[in-house]
UniProtKB/Swiss-Prot annotation:
Entries under HAMAP family matching the protein: KDO8P_synth (MF_00056)
Reaction catalysed by this enzyme: D-arabinose 5-phosphate + phosphoenolpyruvate + H2O = 3-deoxy-alpha-D-manno-2-octulosonate-8-phosphate + phosphate
GO MF annotations in UniProt: 3-deoxy-8-phosphooctulonate synthase activity
Keywords: Cytoplasm, Lipopolysaccharide biosynthesis, Transferase
Pathways involved: Carbohydrate biosynthesis; 3-deoxy-D-manno-octulosonate biosynthesis; 3-deoxy-D-manno-octulosonate from D-ribulose 5-phosphate: step 2/3; Bacterial outer membrane biogenesis; lipopolysaccharide biosynthesis
Protein name: 2-dehydro-3-deoxyphosphooctonate aldolase
Disulfide feature: none
Enzyme class: transferase
Family in the record: Belongs to the KdsA family.
EC number(s) per entry: 2.5.1.55
UniProt GO BP: keto-3-deoxy-D-manno-octulosonic acid biosynthetic process
NCBIfam families: KDO8P_synth, PRK05198.1
C-alpha cells in the first residue's frame, strides 16, 4: 500500500479549489438525478449564479439514493442512465460534478464521468469502499457518520491518504441526538480540520434532516438551513454543501431539507460575506 503522509491542505475539483483558508466554495444541486432535462436546468441556473458571484461551484446529484427510509421510495435514474448526464454537465457547462457511490465495484466506472466521489455518511467506515474510491485518484468527499465523533474522522481520512490519494474533503452533516433528530456541534469543524488536515465542508441541508421523521420518509427543517450555514461559515470552513431544487415540496427525496432554487443566490451572497469576515486578517487594535 502506498502511503501519503497527510491530506492535501488544498484540494482541486475541476477548476474549484477547496481550502480551509481559501475563499468559500460551494457544492450544490438537487438530492437525486430526476431526469436529463431537470439536471441541466438546475446546473445551468447554478452556473449562472456562481459566475455572477465569482464563487467556485461543484454540481452534485445522486444516481441512486440507496438508503431511503422506505423500500418503495424513488431512488434515482440508476448508474447506466446517469453517467452520460454527468458527462454532459461537465462538458457542456464546464462544472465539476460530484455523486455518491455505495459499493466498491462502482468506483472505477463512476470516476470516468465525475470529478468527486462522495462516500455517504452511513458508509464512512467501510474500508473496501474507501480504498476503491481512493484508487481512482479522484477527489473523495467523505461525509462524517451521524454516529462518529469529529476526531474519529482522522482514521477515515487516513484510509484514503494511506492508499496514496491525498485529495480528500471531510464533511460535517450533523450527529444523532435522540430519535429522528440531528444536531450540529460547530466545534467539530475546527476539530476535523486539525485532526484530518483536510479541507472541511459543512452540509447545511442534511444537518437539518429529521431521519425517518415522516414514517416512510425523512423530514427536515429547511428554515434552519441559513442559520446553521451562517454559523459554520463564521467558524471557518472550506465550503458549504447545499441541496437546492426548483420545487422542493414536490421533490422525490429530501424535499423538506432543500433550499428553493429561487432563494439560493441570496443565501450564498450572505454566506460569502460571512466568509470574508471570518477569514480576514486579524487587526491589532492595541
Amino acid at each position: 500500500m502506498t502511503t501519503a503522509a497527510t491530506a492535501a491542505a488544498i484540494v482541486t475539483a475541476g477548476s474549484v479549489r477547496f481550502g480551509n483558508d481559501l475563499p468559500l466554495a460551494v457544492i450544490a444541486g438537487p438530492c437525486q438525478l430526476e431526469s436529463r432535462g431537470h439536471a441541466l436546468e438546475v446546473a445551468s441556473a447554478l452556473k449562472e449564479i456562481a459566475t455572477r458571484l465569482n464563487i467556485g461551484l461543484v454540481y452534485k446529484t445522486s444516481f441512486d439514493k440507496a438508503n431511503r427510509t422506505s423500500g418503495s421510495a424513488a431512488r434515482g435514474l440508476g448508474l447506466a442512465q446517469s453517467l452520460p448526464i454527468f458527462a454532459e454537465i461537465r462538458s457542456s457547462l464546464g462544472l465539476p460534478v460530484l455523486t455518491d457511490i455505495h459499493d466498491a465495484s462502482q468506483c472505477a466506472e463512476v470516476a470516468q464521468a465525475v470529478d468527486v466521489l462522495q462516500i455517504p455518511a452511513f458508509l464512512c467506515r467501510q474500508t473496501d469502499l474507501l480504498l476503491a474510491a481512493a484508487a481512482t485518484g479522484k477527489v473523495v468527499n467523505v461525509k462524517k457518520g451521524q454516529f462518529l465523533a469529529p476526531w474519529d474522522m482522522a482514521n477515515v481520512v487516513a484510509k484514503i491518504t494511506g492508499a496514496g490519494n491525498p485529495n480528500v474533503l471531510a464533511t460535517e452533516r450533523g450527529v444523532s441526538f435522540g430519535y429522528n433528530t440531528l444536531i450540529s456541534d460547530m466545534r467539530s469543524l475546527p476539530i476535523m480540520a486539525r485532526t484530518t488536515g483536510a479541507p472541511v465542508i459543512f452540509d447545511a441541508t442534511h444537518s437539518v434532516q429529521q431521519p425517518g421523521g415522516q414514517g416512510t420518509s425523512s423530514g427536515g427543517q429547511r428554515e434552519f438551513v441559513p442559520v446553521l450555514a451562517r454559523a459554520a461559515v463564521a467558524v471557518g470552513v472550506a465550503g458549504v454543501f447545499i441541496e437546492t431544487h426548483p420545487d422542493p415540496d414536490h421533490a422525490p427525496s429530501d424535499g423538506p431539507n432543500m433550499v428553493p432554487l429561487a432563494e439560493f443566490e441570496g443565501l450564498l451572497r450572505r454566506l460569502m460575506a460571512f466568509d470574508k469576515l471570518a477569514k480576514a486578517p486579524a487587526t491589532d487594535t492595541r
